[in-house]
UniProtKB/Swiss-Prot annotation:
GO cellular component: chloroplast thylakoid membrane
Entry binding sites for [4Fe-4S] cluster 2: 74, 104, 107, 110
Molecular function as annotated in GO: 4 iron, 4 sulfur cluster binding; iron ion binding; NADH dehydrogenase (ubiquinone) activity; quinone binding
UniProt superkingdom: Eukaryota
Cofactor remark: Binds 2 [4Fe-4S] clusters per subunit.
Family stated for the protein in its record: Belongs to the complex I 23 kDa subunit family.
Organism lineage: Eukaryota, Viridiplantae, Streptophyta, Embryophyta, Tracheophyta
Cofactor(s) demanded: [4Fe-4S] cluster
HAMAP family documented for this protein: NDH1_NuoI (MF_01351)
Annotated GO biological process: photosynthesis, light reaction
Protein name as annotated: NAD(P)H-quinone oxidoreductase subunit I, chloroplastic
Length: 183
C-alpha cells in the first residue's frame, strides 16, 4: 500500500514537472509571437546596410600610385596590379587594376591599408551572375559607383530593421522570469 502511495506521489511530481516544461515552451512561443518578422520580400524590399557594411570595392584610378600595398595585405594576394615604370618622371604608372569578386573574401584589408585611399567599400551586395568570369572586375567596372538602395525607386526600403531592438540579444529573458516564478 505504501509503495502505491509513493508511486502516485512520484507520478504527481512528474506531472507537475511536465506542466512546467510545457508552460516554458508556451511562454517562448508567446514571446516569439510578439516579435516583428525579420525577413523581407527580397527583390521588392531591401534592408539598408549598416555604415560598416563590406560590399563591392570601389576603385579610383587617378588616386592609385601602384604601390601594391593592397596585394601585400590581401590574405589571398587577390588584386592584380599592372604598372610600367616611366623613366622621364621616375614613377610607376598604373596600366590596369582588377579584382575577382568570385575569390575575394571581403576582408577590407586592401581598403584599410591603402595609403592614398583610392579603394573604398560600397553598400552594393548584389554581385551574382550566371558566369563566374563576370565577377572579375577591371578598373572601369570597379570605378563605377553603385546605385544606392535609398535612391532606387523600384523597391521599398525598410530602414526599421537595420538595428535590432534593445534587449533582443538577451535571448528569452521573459521566459526565464516565468520559469523562475514556477520554480
Amino acid at each position: 500500500m505504501f509503495s502505491m502511495v509513493e508511486g502516485l506521489q512520484v507520478y504527481g511530481q512528474q506531472t507537475i514537472q511536465a506542466a512546467k516544461y510545457i508552460g516554458q515552451g508556451f511562454m517562448v512561443t508567446l514571446d516569439h509571437m510578439n516579435r516583428l518578422p525579420m525577413t523581407v520580400q527580397y527583390p521588392y524590399e531591401k534592408l539598408i546596410p549598416s555604415e560598416r557594411f563590406r560590399g563591392r570595392i570601389h576603385f579610383e584610378f587617378d588616386k592609385c600610385i601602384a604601390c601594391e600595398v593592397c596585394v601585400r595585405v590581401c590574405p589571398i594576394n587577390l588584386p592584380v596590379v599592372d604598372w610600367e615604370f616611366e623613366k622621364n618622371i621616375r614613377k610607376k604608372q598604373l596600366t590596369s587594376y582588377s579584382i575577382d569578386f568570385g575569390v575575394c573574401i571581403f576582408c577590407g584589408n586592401c581598403v584599410e591599408y591603402c595609403p592614398t585611399n583610392c579603394l573604398s567599400m560600397t553598400e552594393e551586395y548584389e554581385l551574382s551572375t550566371y558566369d563566374r568570369h563576370e565577377l572579375n572586375h577591371d578598373q572601369i567596372a570597379l570605378g563605377r559607383l553603385p546605385l544606392s538602395v535609398v535612391e532606387d525607386s523600384t523597391i521599398r526600403v525598410i530602414s526599421g530593421l537595420t538595428k535590432l531592438p534593445k534587449g533582443t540579444m538577451d535571448g528569452h529573458s521573459a521566459s526565464k522570469n516565468v520559469t523562475n516564478f514556477l520554480h
